[in-house]
Structures are given as structure tokens and as C-alpha cells.
Design a protein with these regions (language model features):
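Helical segment within the ABC ATPase nucleotide-binding domain
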Residues: 151-164
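Hydrophobic anchor residue at the start of the ABC signature
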Residues: 126
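Catalytic Walker B motif of ABC-type/P-loop ATPase nucleotide-binding domains
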Residues: 137-141
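Q-loop/switch helix immediately C-terminal to the Walker
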Residues: 73, 78-94
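Conserved ABC transporter NBD signature motif
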Residues: 50-65
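Conserved beta-strand-loop-alpha-helix hinge in the C-terminal portion
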Residues: 191-213
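Conserved structural motif at the start of ABC-family nucleotide-binding domains
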Residues: 2, 17-19
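Helix-to-loop junction immediately C-terminal to a conserved catalytic motif
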Residues: 45
């Protein structure tokens, strides 16, 4: 169980999250929609230090070594090819199978990773994340920039991860979470506006619209 307790994050004068509390069971796919979703994932990974609140995994502070993170705008070291990145991933994750992932999310092996177009950089970042055996996986805007086929394949991979016993958090537009999450939260104005089970998607859309929460 990941517990987010009264999390508060400010960015200068702006409050991104204001006392957000969530209880996220293990071995499930959880969706996060609404304003502040990326800030929440960055706090879970330790890239943002909360102004207040706690994040725990099984009652203990969540550690970065337990978490894998695919950022919304992935960046790679200049000069490294896609093949170099995959070789490093296999070195740190023996037994992983990049070829199987590349069949679903293809990326040109001999291209420089940092020079790839946005969609291909996104696919590479997702492949590297999915090769990682971490207990918790964070996907920030994973569908942004993907073509229809790649987005479909990614949805199948996310469903597979949930069935394999991983805990996956997907920060995305509300419409993109339909059909892949066990439950999902909608944020707005820095707080949780609603929590919904997977079968309550239509209700979540109605309530988000009634609350004036725009899809971004």
C-alpha cells in the first residue's frame, strides 16, 4: 500500500497540491487526472520535496530505489545511441528482454537517443522503464505524442503490468485512463475532487465537468 498523507507542494506563490491524501493498494494500476498530477508523481519519485505531508510504502518512507519513473519529457545523454541505452538497462537488469518490448514500442537502435523525435524518445523511455523490475512504476503523460498504434500497445502493456503484481501510477488526461486502471483520482484546485472505481468512468467525466476541471 502506498499512502500519501496530507501532501502539500508549492511552486513559488502557487500551490500545486494542498493536503492531498490517497491510499493506493499494491498490485494495481491507479490513474491520476487533473491539475497537479505531474507534481504528485515527481514527489513520489523524490524529484520534488513536499512542503508538508508524508509518502509511505507499506508503512515505511517510499525510497527511490523502489520506484521507476518515465517522465513526460524524457531526456538522454548526448552521444548515446538507443542500443547503448538498452545495453545499460540490460546490464542493470539481467534477464530483461528489450527485444520483446521493442516489438511493441519500436525505436531505431542505431539512432542517437537524445536526437530522436518526441514520440520515439517517449517510446524509448517507456521501454527502459518497463525493463525495470521496480515494485512501483510511475508513468507521467505516457500517451502524449504517441501514435494510435503505439498508444494501443502501451495500454496493453499497462494492463499486463497490473496483472503481474506491479503497482503502477499513470498520470494522464481523464479520457486516457478509461479501461486501464483499477481506480483513479481526479485532482482540481490542489485537492482530490473525486476517487472512482474502474467502472465509474462516465460519472467521473460528468463530475469533473460540473466542477469546471479542464482536461489538459
Amino acid at each position: 500500500m502506498i499512502t500519501i498523507d496530507a501532501l502539500r507542494i508549492r511552486d513559488g506563490e502557487r500551490t500545486l497540491l494542498d493536503g492531498v491524501t490517497m491510499h493506493l493498494p499494491a498490485n494495481a494500476v491507479h490513474g491520476i487526472a487533473g491539475e497537479g498530477r505531474s507534481a504528485l508523481l515527481r514527489a513520489l519519485y523524490g524529484l520534488v520535496v513536499p512542503d508538508a505531508g508524508r509518502i509511505t510504502l507499506g508503512g515505511h518512507p517510499l525510497r527511490r530505489c523502489d520506484v521507476g519513473f518515465a517522465e513526460a519529457e524524457p531526456r538522454f545523454w548526448p552521444g548515446l545511441t538507443v542500443r547503448d541505452c538498452l545495453d545499460l538497462a540490460v546490464r542493470y537488469n539481467p534477464g530483461s528482454n528489450p527485444a520483446a518490448m521493442l516489438r511493441r514500442l519500436p525505436v531505431p537502435l542505431d539512432a542517437e537517443a537524445a536526437a530522436l523525435p518526441e514520440a520515439e524518445r517517449k517510446r524509448l523511455a517507456l521501454v527502459l522503464l518497463l525493463l525495470n523490475p521496480k515494485r512501483v512504476l510511475l508513468l507521467d503523460e505516457p500517451f502524449r505524442g504517441l501514435d494510435v498504434e503505439s498508444a494501443f500497445m502501451l495500454r496493453q502493456l499497462i494492463l499486463q503490468l497490473g496483472s503481474e503484481g506491479r503497482t503502477v501510477l499513470v498520470a494522464a488526461r481523464l479520457a486516457e485512463l478509461d479501461g486501464i486502471c483499477d481506480d483513479f483520482y481526479v485532482l482540481g484546485g490542489g485537492v482530490v475532487r473525486g476517487r472512482y472505481e474502474h467502472y465509474e468512468f462516465a460519472r467521473s467525466v460528468r463530475e469533473a465537468a460540473a466542477s469546471g476541471i479542464a482536461e489538459k
